[in-house]
């Protein structure tokens, strides 16, 4: 199989008997490739993973390709407050559910990373709104600048967690897989 890198790869250290977790990343591909170096690890991928010895095993020097679920949409509005309301274009749906974690990018003032979706409102015509909206657990009350961005988008956000059988490093990279190499 041939792998085509998507975005930037990253790494983090892990130790024996403890779950270590990466920083958040926006899901841009349907696969993440994981390599364990220096020690074996059990690996979990998700919004708030905490790997245990019951998760996917990657031997020292071994690799694994694990599935991700991509989801994204354009952003046409942001309402600031102690929680933040993100509005997507009319005629589209919010591709996230309650409990998912998302990242908003492409806006000068309203960007945030890895915040939890608290609710999704898809009702039509309420208070003159026909767009789908979601409430996010992000305090944007300090932002007084109006939202104005033609390039803002919201994407699913995940982390990688590793529970080591010894000490080592996890390298991870989102990839596209194409045929046989």
Model regions and ranges:
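Intrinsically disordered, low-complexity Pro/Gly/Ser/Thr-rich segments with frequent PxxP/GP/PP motifs
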Residues: 10-12, 51-70
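Short, intrinsically disordered N-terminal pre-domain segments
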Residues: 1-21, 147, 173-181
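Small/polar beta-strand repeat architecture
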Residues: 68-98, 103-175, 179-181
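Short, surface-exposed beta-strand/strand-loop-strand elements in extracellular ectodomains
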Residues: 37-55
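Short proline/glycine-enriched turn/loop motifs at strand-loop junctions of beta-rich domains
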Residues: 29, 35-42, 91-97
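Surface-exposed ligand/attachment interfaces on beta-rich extracellular proteins
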Residues: 8-28, 49-50, 81-91, 109
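Asparagine-centered strand-capping/turn motif at beta-strand->loop junctions
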Residues: 33-38, 162-166
């Amino acid at each position: 199989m041939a792998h085509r890198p998507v975005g930037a790869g990253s790494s983090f250290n892990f130790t024996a008997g403890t779950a270590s977790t990466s920083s958040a990343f926006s899901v841009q591909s349907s696969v993440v490739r994981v390599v364990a170096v220096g020690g074996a690890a059990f690996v979990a991928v998700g919004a708030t993973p905490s790997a245990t010895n019951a998760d996917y095993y990657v031997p020292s020097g071994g690799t694994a390709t694990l599935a991700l679920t991509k989801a994204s949409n354009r952003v046409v509005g942001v309402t600031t407050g102690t929680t933040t309301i993100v509005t997507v274009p009319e005629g589209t749906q919010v591709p996230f559910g309650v409990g998912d974690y998302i990242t908003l990018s492409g806006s000068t003032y309203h960007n945030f990373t890895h915040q939890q979706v608290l609710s999704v409102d898809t009702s039509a015509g309420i208070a003159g709104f026909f767009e789908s909206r979601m409430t996010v657990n992000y305090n944007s009350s300090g932002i007084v600048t109006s939202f104005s961005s033609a390039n803002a988008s919201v994407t699913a956000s995940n982390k990688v967690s590793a529970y080591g059988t010894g000490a080592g490093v996890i390298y991870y990279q989102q990839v596209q897989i194409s045929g046989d190499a």
